[in-house]
């Protein structure tokens, strides 16, 4: 049975994402009944549990449409022993504002929320709970637990956590931006990636020596091969001012020849390349890598002494 660490306690959006990944059969080698969810106190703790052998996988948020990348996840993937992404899922994120049974909005003096959640409901809170003092929480479920234990009057939380703790809902489906979505990934120790599906994502972390044009040259390895680069982001290495590593996502799989060639070129060009995985996305995240089948056939013919007749077009 696969032990999967996630940001707890029970009732977080991460738990909901884990349920979704499990139901879709995306946990390698496991069915829906072969998973044991293991709540931990934070995203870095979930990834450390995999590194330490306390969990087989971790389910962690990596990107949301409001605030962008989840930097604790990126930083934890970039340092320490290597880890690899095997699956992803996306959740529509809308929050519940909950209180203990019997309380109304007029009774709310303190509001528990994790920082990311508070940022996504700021306008609603300003309009409806303007006088409430914010109490920090380490997860959406922890915010609900604070209300259940009497440490806060209200919480910004998930519907799952509201039900888990038996709280009343002041408002449901609360979010300042109606298209708020969060992407979660399933992370484990390095292993052969899931098979190519034709709708895949590949991710790497690049360390590039500081030289004029070095970053442009590295990114050109994607462009010259017709690979759709969907994300490029820098994060400090924490070793000195102005020293950064770069995260890059592209459409395609390591078994796609253009992607494989780009990765080999990056390995030659960069000071270090950390492969974060190739995994299915369900639907293509952008333009697919160009097919190389015709070029492979042409090269094989040339090697066999059977070149294309003069003037004959490949197209």
From Swiss-Prot:
It catalyses: prephenate + H(+) = 3-phenylpyruvate + CO2 + H2O. Pathway: Amino-acid biosynthesis; L-phenylalanine biosynthesis; phenylpyruvate from prephenate: step 1/1. Its EC number is 4.2.1.51. GO terms for cellular component: cytoplasm. It comes from the Bacteria. GO terms for molecular function: prephenate dehydratase activity; protein homodimerization activity. Residues 203-280 form the ACT domain. Keywords: Amino-acid biosynthesis, Aromatic amino acid biosynthesis, Lyase, Phenylalanine biosynthesis. The keyword Lyase applies. It comes from Mycolicibacterium paratuberculosis (strain ATCC BAA-968 / K-10). This is Prephenate dehydratase. The record marks 182 as: Essential for activity. Residues 3-189 form the Prephenate dehydratase domain. GO terms for biological process: L-phenylalanine biosynthetic process. It holds the Pfam family ACT. Homodimer. CDD domains: ACT_CM-PDT, PBP2_Aa-PDT_like.
């Amino acid at each position: 049975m696969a032990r999967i660490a996630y940001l707890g306690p029970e009732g977080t959006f991460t738990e909901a994402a884990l349920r979704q990944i499990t139901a879709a059969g995306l946990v390698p080698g496991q069915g829906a009944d072969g998973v044991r969810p293991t709540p931990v106190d934070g995203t870095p703790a979930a990834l450390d549990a995999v590194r330490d052998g306390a969990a087989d996988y971790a389910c962690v948020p990596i990107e949301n449409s409001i605030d962008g990348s989840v930097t604790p996840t990126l930083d934890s993937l970039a340092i320490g022993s290597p880890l690899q992404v095997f699956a992803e899922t996306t959740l529509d994120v809308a929050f519940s504002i909950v209180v203990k049974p019997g309380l109304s909005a007029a009774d709310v003096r303190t509001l528990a929320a994790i920082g990311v959640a508070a940022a996504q409901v700021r306008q609603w809170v300003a309009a409806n709970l303007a006088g409430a003092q914010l109490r920090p929480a380490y997860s959406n479920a922890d915010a609900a637990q604070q209300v259940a234990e009497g440490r806060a009057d209200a919480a910004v939380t998930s519907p799952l956590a509201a039900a888990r703790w038996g709280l009343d809902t002041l408002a449901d489906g609360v979010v300042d931006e109606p298209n708020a979505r969060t992407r979660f990934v399933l992370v484990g120790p390095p292993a052969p990636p899931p098979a190519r599906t034709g709708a895949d994502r590949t991710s790497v972390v690049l360390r590039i020596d500081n030289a004029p044009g070095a970053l442009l040259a590295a990114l050109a390895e994607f462009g010259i091969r017709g690979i759709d680069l969907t994300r490029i982001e820098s994060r400090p290495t924490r070793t000195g001012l102005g020293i950064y590593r770069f995260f890059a996502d592209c459409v395609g799989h390591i078994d796609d020849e253009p992607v494989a060639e780009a990765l080999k070129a990056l390995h030659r060009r960069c000071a270090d390349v950390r492969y974060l995985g190739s995994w299915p996305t369900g639907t293509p995240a952008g333009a697919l890598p160009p097919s190389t089948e015709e070029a492979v056939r042409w090269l094989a013919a040339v090697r066999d002494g059977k070149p294309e007749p003069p003037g004959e077009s490949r197209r």
